């Protein structure tokens, strides 16, 4: 077992020196079976604030297709507390403009094989033609596939 210390807003975090208040110790297993964990597709995009509702409608449409093709879960998060960093940050990563918000999203799949099959179907689906009316600049989207190595609580 490992014991880690978690923090929530208030006292300074040792690594980033941001302010954190409460610290709590959590015990987790020493080994975690990565093979039994899901596969994640992660995305970060800049969306014009004026397009927020259009983005939500767009996401609901396309996220339902991901689920239809095997995704376990899809999460879309509109930036709320996205600070500027000293070296880099989410806004710089997607070249967000003043009138844009950063959206952080992920698609969770049972495993990489399910993801590969689901994404292949997704890209071939005729409903993808509607993506041409995307409410954000897709050229600035960053994305990637990730193997889950820690998932709590499980």
Feature names for model-found ranges:
Residues 13-16:
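Cysteine-centered motifs
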Residues 22-35, 67, 71-98, 124-154:
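Glycine-rich beta-strand-turn "strand-cap" elements at beta-sheet edges
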Residues 54-67, 102-107:
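Generic detector of contiguous secondary-structure segments
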Residues 40-47, 86-122:
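Short, well-ordered beta-strand segments in beta-rich or mixed alpha/beta enzyme
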Residues 33-61:
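Long, hydrophobic N-terminal alpha-helical segment
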Residues 1-11, 26-32:
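Ser/Thr-rich, low-complexity intrinsically disordered segments
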Residues 57-62, 118-125:
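Short amphipathic alpha-helices in soluble, non-transmembrane regions
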């Amino acid at each position: 077992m490992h014991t880690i210390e978690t923090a929530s807003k208030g006292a300074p975090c040792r690594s980033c020196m941001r302010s954190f208040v409460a610290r709590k110790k959590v015990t987790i297993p020493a080994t975690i079976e990565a093979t039994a964990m899901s596969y994640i597709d992660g995305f970060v995009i800049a969306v014009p604030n004026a397009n927020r509702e259009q983005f939500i409608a767009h996401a609901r449409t396309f996220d339902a297709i991901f689920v239809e093709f095997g995704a376990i879960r899809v999460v879309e998060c509109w930036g709320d507390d996205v600070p500027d960093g000293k070296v880099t940050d989410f806004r710089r990563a997607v070249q967000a403009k003043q009138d844009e918000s950063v959206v952080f999203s992920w698609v969770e799949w049972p495993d990489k094989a399910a993801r590969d099959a689901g994404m292949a179907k997704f890209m071939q689906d005729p409903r993808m033609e509607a993506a041409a009316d995307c409410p954000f600049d897709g050229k600035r989207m960053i994305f990637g596939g990730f193997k889950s190595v820690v998932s709590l609580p499980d």
